[in-house]
Design a protein with these regions (language model features):
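C-terminal, active-site-flanking charged/polar segments
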Residues: 1
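Cysteine-centered metal-binding/redox modules
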Residues: 5-148
């Protein structure tokens, strides 16, 4: 499959998804940053204003493995929330395979990780730790590992 076909699949899901909201007010806590990042990514998709290339081949096995990893995460952490799971799945596929951005927004900080960007490269202080987790999405995230 190529990125055009993958984008079309993502777009078809997103165009019918109408439950996206931006948190009111401005907050720098990790959840608010992630929610806004996902919202603006969603808007980018439905407005078809993405900076990624749409003529690159993508390995179907990698995309399917990625989808399975998202499903696994949600079954472990939020079973039954299929609509939100699929929303996050398609946002994450878009970020990873089409626009090649970090799965977490630049500036997010938690006790477990911080994501930064330098010279158009993303860095994550948690990748080295979390990539060892079963079905970790870190395997596919473009962020590079960085020490604290």
């Amino acid at each position: 499959m190529n990125t055009k076909e993958l984008f079309d699949e993502i777009y078809e899901y997103m165009i019918n998804y109408d439950h996206v909201r931006v948190p009111l007010g401005y907050s720098t806590d990790a959840i608010s940053l992630l929610t806004r990042y996902n919202y603006y990514t969603y808007k980018e998709i439905i407005n078809r204003k993405h900076p990624g290339s749409l003529n690159i081949e993508v390995d179907d096995k990698k995309v399917n493995d990625f989808k399975d990893r998202v499903d696994y995460f949600f079954e472990e952490n939020s079973p039954g929330d299929y609509e939100y799971r699929d929303f996050i799945k398609y946002i994450s596929i878009y970020l990873t395979f089409i626009v090649k951005k970090s799965l977490h927004p630049v500036g997010i900080k938690s006790k477990d990780m911080t994501v930064t960007k330098d010279n158009n490269k993303f860095y994550c202080t948690g990748k080295k730790r979390f990539i060892k987790d079963r079905n970790s999405l870190c395997k596919y995230c473009v962020s590079r590992s960085k020490s604290n």
